[in-house]
């Protein structure tokens, strides 16, 4: 193997000064171009870079002050506090705006419309329940018990007050009927002063601390309570009505009304100066208000009014005699009238009023329509389909329809029978104490819970979004007048072939008409829409920062940059921690084992010889520093 000298020198060839300067300049420019070249994704190296770039380039007013005044710490602190305070005030205003928006306020719009008006439905009742001739046998027993009760409590003999001859006959007949009633219903009898017998679970009028009421007990008589009244008249009527309902429940459906029933009650009917006919009304029977007739309820041919005034409305002459009235059930005379919208049931006890005999009652109407916003703006319902109460009426949804249906459904569920005044649900039967012994106790308990809204009916039944109401005002005058009553009564008796014996107390006249041609519509519109919200937010942003939508995007970009750099720094910290905690790699098989375990405690170091062939090195002009050296040459000695 050949040998080589241990030493030597390599001398580089000297490059001209101009060439070296030119080459260094080219390399510097190339490096600057590489530094200025922007990649597809570039990012900041620290939070300070992000914040400084944002403050230097944003269009938000005041942000540049945080950078420009960095040499003055007092100004920097002042502008920082002012910037944060401004942001806080702005977002406080934002919170107020959002709270107002999500409260869903509405504006009330009042419109006055002029158009042909559809005449409402009008229901008129006789205030005469089932006549004595229809259920006299069923009522005799109840009358005798009531007569005896009045005699016990007030020392008033009702039979003698009416007529002496009929009183003796009625008393004998009632006694036989009462005995027959007790034999047919083998219940426990309760002795009273004059041996008046009452069924065991039948309410009985009682006198306690000058309060009149009746006792109601559960089926096993373990729980009883007094339904008391401050007025004896109210107590007797309520008690009588309770038994009257039981009598109606034991009877088949009300008899069909024919044209003679209508003519016996309605002497004359005109609308828009035209005579009414049978196609203009429907009829039904109310347990307390008697035969009822509803005019203009046929949706296929509704009446319309082109002009206001008494001559362009409905005019009725009705009979108000009380020859066959039930005195213990009906204590008023006349007729009862109610104005309501089509396809709505007539709840006479809620919205009706009485018409006096011998009086012409003129009722003027003003139509009002209400349209509410549904959804988030109000708790109204469009058609009741979203209300958790079954509609028992064959009519459209109203709040009163829902409330009564709710009570009836709870009545069937709790008492196992239905209240006679309300529609009958499928599969149920009306309450009758011959079948449901303690239904009265259950009913009055349930009624108290209903009035206190324990049943939740008032909460479940929501208002409809669209309603039509009629504002009524009435005027009264004597009819007919003293100078014209003779010929008026004569003509009515000849026309209807009926002899009016009581004259003035036997008839009444009713006029129902529109007061004005206009009708009012109360509507709702959103008071704070999305457009209004965005406008208010923009106004607040411009007020506090004088910026635009793009400034908001800059702020969103800043938040995104802070999020990304936080993720990057966290990722770097995690990788660095993982790299420092990893063990050293094992030595490779080609490594020189002479350098392993150098400090293992050996006595003498290993000796080795390295032989190399030294040749002349090439010239590396790029390694020379740009600019002249001290000696004017570059090389290795």
From Swiss-Prot:
GO cellular component entries: acrosomal vesicle; apical plasma membrane; ciliary membrane; cytoplasm; motile cilium; plasma membrane; sodium channel complex
Pfam family, one: ASC
Cellular compartments annotated: Apical cell membrane; Cell projection, Cilium; Cytoplasmic granule; Cytoplasm
InterPro entries the UniProt entry points to: ENaC (IPR001873), ENaC_chordates (IPR004724), ENaC_CS (IPR020903)
The keyword Nucleotide-binding is annotated on this UniProt entry: no
Start and end residues of each stretch annotated as Disordered: 1-34
Transmembrane regions listed in the UniProt entry: 77-97, 549-569
GO molecular function: ligand-gated sodium channel activity
Disulfide bonds: 125-292, 217-224, 269-276, 380-465, 402-442, 402-461, 406-457, 415-442, 415-465, 417-431
This protein's record includes keyword Transport: yes
Sorted UniProt keywords: Cell membrane, Cell projection, Cilium, Cytoplasm, Cytoplasmic vesicle, Disulfide bond, Flagellum, Ion channel, Ion transport, Membrane, Sodium, Sodium channel, Sodium transport, Transmembrane, Transmembrane helix, Transport
Reactions listed under catalytic activity: Na(+)(in) = Na(+)(out)
Tissue spec. comment: The long isoform has been found in cochlea, colon, and cartilage. The short isoform is only found in cochlea.
Regulation: Originally identified and characterized by its inhibition by the diuretic drug amiloride.
Basic and acidic residues composition bias: residue spans: 11-34
NCBIfam families hit by this protein: ENaC
Official protein name in the record: Epithelial sodium channel subunit alpha
Source organism of the structure: Gallus gallus (Chicken)
